[in-house]
A protein has these predicted regions:
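Long amphipathic alpha-helical repeat/alpha-solenoid cores
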Residues: 1-95
Length: 95
């Protein structure tokens, strides 16, 4: 899970994620780290400032095919979406 460090995750964030997730999920994230990184990169490039919080709560979304992942977020005005995500990550459930 060291690959998450380039997105601002600290060791404590990664340790907490490991403690609160199944070993199967951790293996899945590791096995698909290129895909997960690509999806994290997309949100980072969009200007999302709370990547860690979003990832911790909705990590399963980051295993989604990148084109589908991008399509979900492209339905909305990016500035507006970034602002709303900063205020309330729970809107991820409705995207």
């Amino acid at each position: 899970m060291k690959f998450l460090e380039k997105f601002g995750f600290e060791k404590k964030d990664i340790d907490a994620l490991k403690e609160n997730s199944t070993s199967a999920l951790i293996k899945e994230l590791e096995a698909h780290k290129k895909l997960v990184s690509k999806n994290l990169e997309y949100l980072n490039d969009m200007g999302v400032t709370n990547l860690i919080e979003i990832f911790v709560h909705y990590h399963d979304m980051f295993l989604m095919d990148n084109s589908n992942f991008v399509e979900i977020f492209n339905k909305y005005d990016q500035k507006d979406l970034v602002s709303k995500l900063a205020k309330n990550v729970q809107i991820m459930e409705y995207l």
